[in-house]
């Protein structure tokens, strides 16, 4: 589905827990009709210890949301 929303556009979230937020689009996923919006739908993900990061820990990461839940600001 063709969309007018592109990477680095400013969008307003119109549905969900982050309703009303205005933020920048980090990525557009056209095959699944989803977008990743900066600071919206953030989840805490556990990271296993590795050689680079022997302690492991948690990171905060944005998950994609459906494109119908945002509009251009």
UniProtKB/Swiss-Prot annotation:
Keyword rRNA-binding: yes
Basic and acidic residues composition-biased segments: 51-65
GO molecular function: rRNA binding; structural constituent of ribosome
Region Disordered, annotated ranges: 51-73
InterPro entries assigned: KOW, Rib_uL2_dom2, Ribosomal_uL24, Ribosomal_uL24_CS, Ribosomal_uL24_KOW, Translation_prot_SH3-like_sf
GO (cellular component) term, any one: ribonucleoprotein complex
GO biological process, one term: translation
Entries under SUPFAM superfamilies matching the protein: Translation proteins SH3-like domain (SSF50104)
Pfam family, one: KOW
Record keywords, A-Z: Ribonucleoprotein, Ribosomal protein, RNA-binding, rRNA-binding
The family this protein is said to belong to: Belongs to the universal ribosomal protein uL24 family.
Function (record text): One of two assembly initiator proteins, it binds directly to the 5'-end of the 23S rRNA, where it nucleates assembly of the 50S subunit. One of the proteins that surrounds the polypeptide exit tunnel on the outside of the subunit.
Subunit and partners: Part of the 50S ribosomal subunit.
Name under which the protein is recorded: Large ribosomal subunit protein uL24
Organism: Helicobacter pylori (strain Shi470)
